[in-house]
From Swiss-Prot:
GO process annotations (BP): glycine betaine biosynthetic process from choline; negative regulation of DNA-templated transcription
Protein name per Swiss-Prot or TrEMBL: HTH-type transcriptional regulator BetI
Pathway in which this enzyme or protein is active: Amine and polyamine biosynthesis; betaine biosynthesis via choline pathway [regulation]
Keyword vocabulary terms for this entry: DNA-binding, Repressor, Transcription, Transcription regulation
Gene: betI
């Protein structure tokens, strides 16, 4: 009989092991055997919890996207009466949270983005994440701008966030957070009306 609470512990171990494997060898070369070995479990445990490698990869993607959602929401909840500018900066901060810019997370995101073009479930997850970012940004810009301008500003800031993140991921270096925050803050202030 399985121990109570073991399922969540095992799932976490396997997701963490998957991120480590992707970080070291890439998604396509990360095998079930390697992941199981890193997690200290048998390959049968992966089949038990996730069916197969695709199920494990999907769970890993869901985990990363939920960490992103939580990073953004935690910052927004801390600013319930905050200005649009502060709340936009909070959304940016969530996207540049350590859970999203660690080497393992960046490599996993790149692998998932590439795979999402060919795997419908990963595509849906990627689309949900992209739409959520754009919706959050437009909603905050909408507090200060007409609809069309808010949509354009939201799209531009989303592109800037993704571009800064992608340049860092492809450089193999850590994201320069002060620079990223400075550039996004400048974009935000350029697009919001001045009093």
């Amino acid at each position: 009989m399985p121990k109570l609470g073991m399922q969540s512990i095992r799932r976490r171990q396997l997701i963490d092991a998957t991120l480590e494997a992707i970080n070291e060898v890439g998604m396509h070369d990360a095998t079930i055997a390697q992941i199981a070995r890193r997690a200290g479990v048998s390959t049968g445990i992966i089949s038990h919890y996730f069916r197969d490698k695709n199920g494990l990869l999907e769970a890993t993607m869901r985990d990363i996207t939920s960490q992103l959602r939580d990073a953004v929401l935690n910052r927004l909840h801390a600013l319930p009466q905050g200005s649009a500018e502060l709340r936009l900066q909070a959304i940016v901060g969530g996207n540049f949270d350590e859970t999203q810019v660690s080497s393992a997370a960046m490599k996993a995101w790149l692998a998932f983005w590439a795979s999402s073009m060919h795997q419908p479930m990963l595509y849906r997850l990627q689309q949900v994440s992209s739409r959520r970012l754009l919706s959050n940004l437009v909603s905050e810009f909408r507090r200060e701008l007409p609809r069309q301008q808010a949509q354009e500003a939201g799209y531009g800031l989303a592109a800037l966030i993704d571009g800064l993140w992608l340049r860092a991921a492809l450089s193999g270096k850590a994201l320069d957070k002060p620079l990223a925050h400075s550039l996004t803050r400048h974009f935000i202030t350029q697009h919001l009306p001045t009093d």
